[in-house]
């Protein structure tokens, strides 16, 4: 397992908090602009909805607020097949094997894939590379979370799918 891996721990305990902080900073700059009646740093209503809005709706509301809280799926490291005491449950099956901070879906993966939102705002010349880097970071985070025994493939796949669909839908609607 990748539980004691430096990069895995950095992703798990540091980088993702900085990503969430960046969404908060974007919101704060936008709010300052609203209060001072000007656009600051090019952050208008559309930018704040795409970035801070999708961070709130995706990782916080959908993934952590609904699925992780109410789905009850035990983490791989906690199921009997891997030496734990909990029973395996399917990804879309509501279970009673976990009471808090459950496996389905992956919050870390959702936050990592959120980088797609600011990547879509990159200048056209660099957008392909920004999107590729965002998706690569999301996939790397997903692989590390699986390797740490924290999530099944389906947990990270559903998180990635929810975030990509949400962000692309909001982007297409606004831009």
Region spans (language model):
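N-terminal transmembrane-helix/juxtamembrane module of multi-pass inner/ER membrane proteins
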Residues: 1-27, 68-76, 80-87
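Membrane-embedded catalytic cores of phosphoryl/pyrophosphoryl-handling enzymes
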Residues: 88-175
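Membrane-interface loops
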Residues: 41-123, 129
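Juxtamembrane "helix-exit" motif on the non-cytosolic side of transmembrane helices
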Residues: 1, 34-35, 144-147
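Hydrophobic core of alpha-helical transmembrane segments in multi-pass integral membrane proteins
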Residues: 16-34, 118, 165
């Amino acid at each position: 397992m990748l539980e004691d891996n430096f990069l895995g721990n950095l992703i798990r305990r540091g980088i993702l908090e900085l990503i969430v902080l960046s969404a908060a900073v974007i919101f704060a700059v936008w709010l300052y602009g609203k209060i001072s009646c000007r656009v600051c740093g090019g952050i208008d209503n559309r930018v704040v909805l795409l970035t801070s809005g999708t961070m709130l709706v995706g990782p916080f509301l959908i993934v952590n607020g609904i699925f992780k809280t109410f789905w009850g799926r035990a983490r791989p490291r906690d199921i009997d097949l891997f030496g734990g005491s909990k029973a395996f449950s399917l990804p879309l099956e509501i279970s009673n094997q976990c009471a808090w901070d459950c496996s389905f879906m992956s919050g870390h993966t959702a936050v990592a894939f959120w980088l797609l939102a600011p990547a879509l705002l990159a200048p056209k010349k660099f957008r392909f590379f920004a999107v590729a880097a965002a998706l690569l970071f999301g996939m790397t985070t997903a692989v590390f979370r699986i390797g740490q025994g924290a999530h099944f493939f389906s947990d990270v796949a559903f998180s990635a799918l929810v975030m990509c669909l949400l962000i692309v839908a909001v982007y297409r609607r606004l831009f």
